[in-house]
Every structure is written in C-alpha cells, then in structure tokens.
C-alpha cells in the first residue's frame, strides 16, 4: 500500500456506478511541487495498472482525471485533483492507496 501525505480524497458515485475521488490541497508555494509529485505518483499507478484506458468514461474509457492549480495569494497555492473511474478501477485504487 502506498501512503499519501497531501491527498485526502472524498468519494462519490454516479448512477452508472462510476466513482470519483476528489482531493484539494492548499500549501505554501515552496511545497506545491510535493503535492504535484504525489499526484504524478497516483497518475503513474493508474497508467501502469490500466494502460491505454484513460479517456471519457461516457465513451467507454476506464479512468480519467482533472487537475487545477491556482495561486490564491502570494503565500498559498491550491491544487484540486479529481480522478474518476469504473468500479474495477476504483476498487484497485482503494486497495493500492488504502483509501476508504
């Protein structure tokens, strides 16, 4: 199991069974690279575990993500990360990263 320091996910599910994990992290700009590195680790796992499966879930893909980064103030960056997937993808993500 891989431990995440910055990403604390909330989970929701749509009527078709697709799940979405949403996380937001606000840090000093000097630490933003650590948040982005953690996101890169999650995305690398997703791509390695479900290769060539990223895309719009409505079009039959297995997983997709959205990433936004904003500077809220000179001393605060906020990163929002959403990761969506099929039930199999969500189960594997939970198991690998120990998510509830």
Q: Which residues does each predicted region cover?
A:
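Amphipathic protein-protein interaction modules
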Residues: 37-87
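Mixed-charge, glycine-accented linear interaction segment located at domain edges/termini
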Residues: 86, 90-100
